[in-house]
Design a protein with these regions (language model features):
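Domain-level recognition of nuclease-like catalytic cores that cleave nucleotide substrates
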Residues: 94-134
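Short acidic/glycine-enriched loop/turn segments that link adjacent beta-strands
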Residues: 37-40
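A generic structural motif
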Residues: 35, 47-49, 110-112
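Conserved catalytic cores of phosphodiester-cleaving nucleases, focusing on short active-site segments
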Residues: 22, 42-48, 52-65, 84
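Mg2+/Mn2+-dependent nuclease catalytic core
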Residues: 64-88
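Metal-dependent nuclease catalytic cores in nucleic-acid-processing enzymes
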Residues: 85-97
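Acidic-basic catalytic patches of nuclease active cores, encompassing PD-(D/E)XK
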Residues: 1-33
């Protein structure tokens, strides 16, 4: 995928950071930016293989430079949650090997601006089970 806009490059940067962070926590990477037609996109699809039964972890990655409009977690509205859940249903239809897996929806968020010219790695906040299918 060609990243043309600054927003796309920023999103890719934080998704890559989140992927590395989650792998360091024991999750296994499966896919990034999985999308289905006009339905939506899943930022990261990870596996938690040590859990019994194994767990498919759908990860929404968020970042906000400033919090005057709320935190990055606040931006995951009920409508956004429904979109992620519907996209996950399409993902499961395309990947029947995960039919027996538990499904979990996590969020990895980053707050604050990147400091230009500084080698600063933002610290993630990882919320397991951030929302559920209900």
């Amino acid at each position: 995928m060609k990243l043309t806009s600054p927003k796309q490059r920023q999103g890719d940067y934080y998704e890559t950071l989140a992927k590395g962070y989650l792998e360091a926590q024991g999750l296994t990477f499966f896919d990034k930016n999985w999308h289905y037609k006009n339905l939506g996109e899943l930022d990261l699809v990870m596996l938690e293989p040590t859990q019994k039964p194994p767990c498919l972890v759908i990860v929404e990655v968020r970042q906000r430079k400033a919090s005057q409009f709320g935190t990055s977690l606040d931006s995951i509205t009920p409508a956004k949650q429904r979109k992620i859940i519907k996209t996950t249903a399409a993902f499961l239809q395309a990947h029947p090997q995960f039919d027996t897996f538990d499904i979990r929806f996590d969020v990895v968020s980053y707050e604050g601006a990147v400091i230009a010219g500084k080698a600063v790695t933002p610290m993630p906040t990882w919320i397991k089970d951030a929302f559920s299918v209900n």
